[in-house]
Structure formats: structure tokens, C-alpha cells
Amino acid sequence: MASYNPGMRPTPASPASAAGSPASLSPISALSPLDGRYAGRLGSLRPLMSELGYMHRRVQVEIAWFIALSDAGFTEFKPLSPGARTYLLGLVKNFSEEDGEAIKAIEKTTNHDVKAVEYWIKSKFEARPELERAAEFVHFACTSEDINNTSHALQLKGAREQVVLPSLDAVIDKLREMAQAFADVPMLSRTHGQTASPTTVGKEMANVVVRLQTARERIAAVRLMGKMNGAVGNYNAHLSAWPEFDWEAFSRHVVETPEPLGLGLTFQPYSIQIEPHDYMAELFDAVARTNTILIDLSRDIWGYVSLGYFKQKLKPGE
């Protein structure tokens, strides 16, 4: 038997390596179908769940913490002027892709993504004496996870409120419309694949509407948690700086105060360095159960098509 000789079958160079540079990101060069084949359907999530969206939320958390510290009563950090507050909130509101690129450039030196955000914010204080004097209060007493866990929660909050629930509502509304339109259209039911008692097309759609409404309520009801209690969850650095201050109440205030001055999340009072993320498991499970309902619907529709109940609408070019 002839032995295999790797040298007999050289690996062909990829177009990218042949050209001497990486291929630019496009739907056909993306590693994931999320940014490839299905990019057009997920565009609304990109500003929320991308690294740019993550940076944006980190800036939001750092600014909210910084502004709150100015009102805490520190001798070294007087309350900020209305103009300074407006400027800081503008950094969040007007955060751009160019700002994200600037943070990535800083990260090349720091080799630390959260520290890069901190330095970028401080760079925006230049030529503003009021803010320059207080620059060292940016990220004061925080551990990186204080910024990260709250940023993740804000990302999920945005995705749920701006994309997931509106998309689910659109499906529910369409199915409800079909349930009403076809309420009197008879359809032969089946059990165990065999013909059974009659029903209506509208009733079958209504079944799914009720299931999806319940699933939607579960998704919407999940409390998105955030903690800001330091490196091991005990406010160690905070208490070293100001032992008499009620840091737990302060942290709760920042986490639960509505946006833009706070984060509009539910305060997590007990944790280690990381927020335990049980709420994420609850949220993702609720989404998964919703997807199961949609899979059931898709399979039922497939069955109805195979039985000749439904027929695909032809579109030019398809």
C-alpha cells in the first residue's frame, strides 16, 4: 500500500493569502452566518450587540457612575455643573463608530479593553478644567466586572426592547389577523396523523397566538440584573476610601435609577466578583421556549402544505 505523502497534495492558497492581505468582511467572507447569509435580517441587532455596542454601554456605565460620584459628597469631587453633565451625557448619546475606533487604538497600548474606555473618557476631559480636576474619579473603586456585567445587561435590555419583543409582536399580530380572517374556514383535524374532528384554520392560528402571548410575557418579565460592588463583591475599595458612606445604597441608586442618569436595571445586592447571570439563563430559556413554539408552527405549516391546505405564493424571480 502506498503511503500518504502530504507533499503530493499541497494545500491551495486561499484568495486572501494569495492576495497577501485578509479578505474584507462581507456577507460571503464572514465566518458566521449571522454576519454572512443572514446579515440583512440581523442588522437591527448590530449596533446593540456588537463590540461597538458593548463599548457604547461601557461608556454609559462609566459616565453614570462618575456623575453619581459628583453628587455623593466627596470633598475632592464637587457636584458637576449643568453644562458638564450635559457634555458627559452627550458622550453617551452621540457615541459613534469613530469613537469606538479611538478606543480600540488606545487598547493597542493598554492591552485592556475596559482601561481603554476609561482612558478615552479622560481624553474627552481635555480643555475642560472642571472635568480634568475630577478625572481620577472615572472608574473610581470599580472592578472591570462592575462595568462589564452592567453593560451586558444594558445590551440585552436594548435588544429585548428594540428588537426581540417588537419582532415577536409582529408575528403575533400577523397570526391574530389570520385567526380572525380564517375563523370560519373549515379544516379537517388530525390526531396521530389520522383524520379526526373538524376545526377551522382560524382556530389553529389562535392556538399559536395564545402560546406566543404567554411566551412574550415571560421574556418581558425577566429582571435584568446589575451589580457594582467591587472586585469580590464586598465594597472593599469603596470602604477604604470612605468607610462611613453607604456604598450599597449608592450602588443601588446608580443601577436602578432610570436612564440616562442611571442604568435602569435591577440591583443585584449579593455577588462575588461576577454577577451570577442567573437572569441570563432565565431570559435565554424564555427565548428558547418561544423558538420552540415557532418551530411547532413551522412544522404544522409544513404539514398543512403537504396536505394541500396551504400553497406558497409565487413571487417573480423565485
What label would you give each PLM region?
Residues 1-3, 73, 265, 269, ...:
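Short intrinsically disordered, low-complexity coil segments enriched in acidic
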Residues 2-238, 242-256:
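A helix-coil-helix interface module used to build multimeric assemblies
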Residues 181-185, 218, 225, 260-269, ...:
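Conserved helix-loop functional segments at active or binding sites
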Residues 215, 272-318:
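Glycine-rich anion/phosphate-binding loop at the beta-strand->alpha-helix junction
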Residues 247-277:
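Active-site-adjacent "gating/activation" loops or surface patches in catalytic cores
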